[in-house]
Amino acid sequence: MNPTHYICKYTPTELLTALGGTCVLLDEAPENFDLSDQVAHPNLCGFGKSILQAVLSGGIRELVLVNCCDTIRSAYDILKEYGNLDFLYMLDLLHNQGGCSVDHAKGQLIALAEAYGTYKGTRFDRAAFLAAFQPERPLTGPHITVLGARMGADLFQMTQQLLPLPTENSTCVNNRSVGAPDPAAEDFDALMEQYARALLGQIPCMRMTDKSGRKQLYNDPGLAGVVYHTVKFCDYYGFEYAQLKEELSVPLLKLESDGTRQSQEQLRTRLEAFAEGFQRQEAPNTGPAAQGYYAGIDSGSTTTDVVILDQDKNIKAKVILPTGAGASGGAARALDQALAAAGLSQQ
């Protein structure tokens, strides 16, 4: 049996499961876009191209999309003509979380259930639907969170391996959290209305009109640092990064990829520099009053940022210097100046 691939947190995976489907997140970054470039405009963003590349490579037979943005709508149109899929469907969801948006989403869910059930030759299994909801298990204690646009399984795995603290993937589809409807709902129509409300009531993605709920992703007492990922030519998440750069008191690293695996070694270097900033700076051992410090380093192509925090997450010093000819040398100079400003040393 072929799995049904999906890309978006608003995909009703529990409904598809209740109709006999096996849902798999399409989250792999290709090596290149040699196939997608043959059928898509060169300016299509890397995420859209990665979807096309995966389908055209022949490993996907069933795909459910959500109209997240113009790129996904374009990808859907291209796949209708060139994808040769057994099942291709796109949900049309509005950008609000209540009112008419819930009614519209309910209609979309009912239409999808009819189309998918006809394709599979199955009927809705209420018990399987309710059993498909899984409670979220967020990290507790000090941790680093990856925010922004999806970064792909390979890049996230590398991020986990390089960073010194437990790392949580809260990008895009990976912060999905859908509450289970009331099992006492009398009929399928009422159940789908509750389900639509739960889907739209998740922590919003950047396509939604009201994005204030996204603060839950970083207003966390255990948050020790943030890696913020964006995709080249995608504007949605750049605005949030600009806001967080001003608001966050924890170390922040921005990464940008093009949707392929080709830039991963360059990103590895930046992640390694960021990880070094979490090495605990030991103060002289004076007994119970001894205090630890943390330094975060973000070495970019033009500037290098260093921030030093105490164990209570208070900023002790912050320095921004031109990176210069060598990233490692620029990071060392910036760290030395930040330590001097904080009255500390690396010993």
Task: Give the ranges of each region predicted by the language model.
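An N-terminal assembly and electron-transfer interface module characteristic of large anaerobic redox
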Residues: 1-294, 312, 324
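Short, intrinsically disordered/low-complexity patches at protein termini
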Residues: 277-278, 329, 339-342
